[in-house]
Design a protein with these regions (language model features):
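Bacterial Sec-dependent N-terminal signal peptides
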Residues: 1-22
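Glycoside hydrolase catalytic-domain context in secreted enzymes
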Residues: 20-460
Length: 463
């Protein structure tokens, strides 16, 4: 018994000693702000600067010497993008990065149902976590202002109140998975044409009543951990290092304590990036900052040029301490958050959520009566029609993605034609009718004229 007592005492002392040796920044039981302060005090200037810029296409550095991990980011307007190569835009061709295709955010907004937004955020958050992403580049809350904006489908409509209400539960549920929302594109990126240099000038009333409410709600109500800057200028200064938008409004008025991350290639000036509120620079062109070159991330505006300005006293040291503190806070909330769940991917629950959101978001503009049948066409009554003709290239294409940042690698997807055939069987005939892309004529003779009872045309408006 005596030996057992001493063994227990020795074990207790050992545990106490080990616990006492854990640095504050590594101790999950400590408040995040104490961990940030402790980690910052241990870092060199070079390590702080390294946090502020990309080390690959979709990651930024950690602090290996201190065991602080890097941040991994992913596009995700409506699904987690497939893995990209370290240093170019080619796909890595992994075999385990297929995901669920969720409806576009314009469909989510069309549900007018915050519960659907919560389901969306939860499901896409679980898939992001399973894929070991720390930052999901979304949701997008820019306001519709031109129908020719090819990215309107990524956003939540033209009404600032609707976008404000719908983005909050998405962000909250996403971040419960230890994955940061990166709300984009802040601000006034409402058209894609000339987006890299267009200068947006507007009244304060329009800014605060139309274009900022969704971002404000994302920060103050949703608690967003990161914000993506836009490509455009705002009143003469680029949005990614705009003093008025970032320091005055976002970090000042709204008390945002997270990170501002550039859109890829959105930084343009080292001094402005240093003092005007930018925290992490991603995707810049690195060969003289005009074209891409291999492994030259140290040439970024917030890399060696920033380090040199700090050493020369041209910008205050307080700027790097603020940036590093914000980035550390983000890392502790995500990559170093040991309480986060493991996540899951392509589950039946995720498919069910995607279907439910899609069903609620569908808007039927017109369901005209069929002259001969005397009733609305939809839903098609199989008993009334012997044959159903489906025409159009889009009936056999998987319309689950856009291009670039909204590309998806989907595990399971059903085309409209396959879906119709699953319901109506051999009654469904198909004619391509046209090829997607530029118009092609002369295909009318492909339509089987003698067997048409009902016709569904799958098309899309010309841009």
């Amino acid at each position: 018994m005596k030996n057992q007592f001493f063994a227990t005492l020795l074990l207790a002392c050992s545990i106490t000693t080990v616990s006492a040796q854990i640095p504050v920044y590594m101790d999950d039981a400590q408040p995040i702000e104490a961990r940030v302060k402790d980690a910052l005090s241990r870092m060199t200037l070079e390590e702080k600067v390294a946090l502020c810029h990309a080390q690959s296409k979709f990651s930024s550095a950690g602090v290996p010497r201190l065991g602080i991990p890097e941040l991994w980011m992913s596009d995700g307007p409506h699904g987690v993008r497939a893995e990209i190569n370290w240093n170019d835009w080619g796909y890595a061709n992994w075999t385990n990065d297929s995901i669920t295709a969720f409806p576009a955010l314009t469909c989510l907004a069309a549900t007018w149902n915050p519960e659907m937004s919560a389901k969306y955020g939860k499901a896409i958050g679980e898939e992001s976590r399973y894929r070991e992403k720390d930052v999901l580049l979304g949701p997008g809350v820019n306001i519709y202002r031109t129908p020719m904006n090819g990215r309107n489908f990524e956003y939540m409509g033209e009404d600032p109140y609707l976008a404000s209400v719908m983005c909050v539960p998405y962000i909250q549920e996403l971040q419960k998975n230890g994955v940061a929302a990166c709300v984009k594109h802040y601000a006034l990126n409402n058209q894609e044409l000339w987006r890299g240099h267009i200068d947006v000038n507007l009244s304060d009333r329009a800014l605060y009543e139309i274009y900022l409410p969704a971002f404000k709600a994302a920060v103050e109500e949703g608690g967003a951990w990161s914000i993506m800057g836009a490509y455009n200028k705002i009143r003469g200064q680029h949005a990614c290092h705009n003093d008025f938008a970032l320091n005055k409004i976002l970090k000042g008025d709204w008390k945002f304590d997270g990170c501002v991350i550039t859109d890829w290639g959105g930084a343009h000036d080292t001094y402005e990036a240093a003092v005007n509120g930018l925290d992490i620079e991603m995707g810049s062109y690195t060969n003289g900052l005009t074209s891409e070159s291999a492994f030259t991330y140290n040439d970024y505006y917030l890399a060696n040029p920033y380090l040199q300005m700090l050493k020369d006293g041209k910008v205050p040291m307080s700027t790097i301490d603020d940036k590093a503190s914000r980035i550390l806070r983000l890392i502790f909330r995500t990559a170093m958050n040991r309480q986060k769940p493991y996540g899951s991917i392509t589950t039946e629950a995720h498919y069910a959520a995607a279907r439910e959101i899609g069903n609620e978001g569908i808007v039927l503009l017109k369901n005209a009566s069929v002259v001969k049948k005397g009733a609305p066409l939809l839903p098609i009554d199989a008993a009334k029609y012997r044959n159903i003709l489906v025409v159009g290239d889009n009936a056999v294409r998987l319309l689950n993605q856009g291009g670039g940042s909204s590309e998806l690698k989907v595990k399971d997807m059903v085309s409209p034609l396959d879906g119709l055939r699953a319901v109506y069987g051999d009654k469904v005939a198909y004619a391509k009718g046209y090829a997607a892309g530029r118009p092609m004529y002369g295909r009318a003779d492909e339509i089987p004229q003698n067997m048409v009872d009902s016709c569904l045309l799958y098309t899309s408006p010309s841009p």
